[in-house]
Amino acid sequence: MSVIYLDNNATTKVDPEVVEAIMPYLTDYYGNPSSMHTFGGQLGKAVRTAREQVAALLGADESEIVFTSCGTEGDNAAIRAALLAQPEKRHIITTQVEHPAVLNVCKQLETQGYTVTYLSVNGHGQLDLDELEASLTGNTALVTIMYANNETGTVFPIEEIGKRVKERGAIFHVDAVQAVGKIPLNMKTSTIDMLTISGHKIHAPKGIGALYVRRGVRFRPLLIGGHQERGRRAGTENVPGIVGLGKAAELELIHIETAIKKETRLRDRLEQTLLAKIPDCEVNGDVTQRLPNTTNIGFKYIEGEAILLSLNKYGICASSGSACTSGSLEPSHVLRAMGLPYTTLHGSIRFSLCRYTTEAQIDRVIEVMPEIVERLRALSPFKNDEAGWLQAQEQTLAHR
């Protein structure tokens, strides 16, 4: 049975061209890029090329790219660097729907005397810019907001947010882990000060990422040690990973326009057909301002985990939320922040596509989903009894 992988917001397949680019740096070119000898110099050149490739994808200067190990490190580094550079300011603004790499850092900072404002979202997952405006003060050191939500695909009005942030003199950090490669970016014309990306979301290996730091932004490094990355991130460079990220960035820039069109078409077909064939289901999130590859659909009166297990029997991989919170018994914090009823958020499934997704794969999901939902609803003692279903959920949670 072949795998139908529709969980690309969790991670992606490494592109074969990326694998080919990496292999020599795992076997033949194994020196240290900081070494003075020719062997080390060859690796230094490879790192510089990769930096240029990543910069081109972001519309940035290569001097503004700092290689990291992942998106989580990038988020941590950006947040803490901004605060270390402005010790007199003790206020942070973020949203209720951020990735744990941002939310949990902010929660920890609250225990260290910082005040954090968590902006709310509406039923479509969008921010109220007036709430942002009212929250900004002279004491605000940092505003950290994701470009696009990893669970719903909702895209925030980043440049409008950035204009308001800059008017108040705060640093603006954006987690663009889900947006890069799906939305064209140009840091040269952007209001963003720092931006995080992660390799494994754009068909590069796991364990490599990058942080964009605008020239002139005060930056205090998270990792202290050697001189690597111009003193902004200590530690011997992961050359195979960096080369892989560079090649992946080059390929994303080549494919981005065709990928956006293809993924949008396949996503819309999947979404519209399921909504037409299956009663009591709805799309979660903004249906206009969103990523081209992502749909999050709530199937009422059944559990998302049961849907995923049923899909898995057909070799179909999807998600009920962020892979970084999948071990939690609680429903998605993103969908809860949107105020969705429990009958919807407990049965919500995210399908996330990529440039490798095919028509035949979408056809297969469309074929099996109606039967899965019908069977699971038939097994439910409450079916479409919303009050009874909610009571059963509360009792289940109380005994866990």
UniProtKB/Swiss-Prot annotation:
UniProt enzyme class: transferase
Keyword Protein transport: no
Key words of the record: Iron, Iron-sulfur, Metal-binding, Nitrogen fixation, Pyridoxal phosphate, Transferase
Cofactor section: pyridoxal 5'-phosphate
Keyword Iron-sulfur on entry: yes
Modification type N6-(pyridoxal phosphate)lysine: residues: 201
Pfam families: Aminotran_5
Other observations noted: Belongs to the NIF1 gene cluster which is expressed in heterocysts under anaerobic and aerobic conditions.
InterPro entries: Aminotrans_V_dom, Aminotrans_V_PyrdxlP_BS, Cys_deSase_NifS_bac/arc, Cysteine_dSase, PyrdxlP-dep_Trfase, PyrdxlP-dep_Trfase_major, PyrdxlP-dep_Trfase_small
PANTHER family per UniProt: CYSTEINE DESULFURASE (PTHR11601:SF34), CYSTEINE DESULFURYLASE FAMILY MEMBER (PTHR11601)
Name of the protein in its database record: Cysteine desulfurase 1
EC number: 2.8.1.7
GO MF term list: cysteine desulfurase activity; iron-sulfur cluster binding; metal ion binding; pyridoxal phosphate binding
Sites where the protein binds [2Fe-2S] cluster: 324
Family (UniProt): Belongs to the class-V pyridoxal-phosphate-dependent aminotransferase family. NifS/IscS subfamily.
Quaternary data: Homodimer.
Taxonomic path: Bacteria, Bacillati, Cyanobacteriota, Cyanophyceae, Nostocales
Amino acids binding pyridoxal 5'-phosphate: 71-72, 150, 178, 198-200, 236
Naturally occurring in which organism (per UniProt): Trichormus variabilis (strain ATCC 29413 / PCC 7937) (Anabaena variabilis)
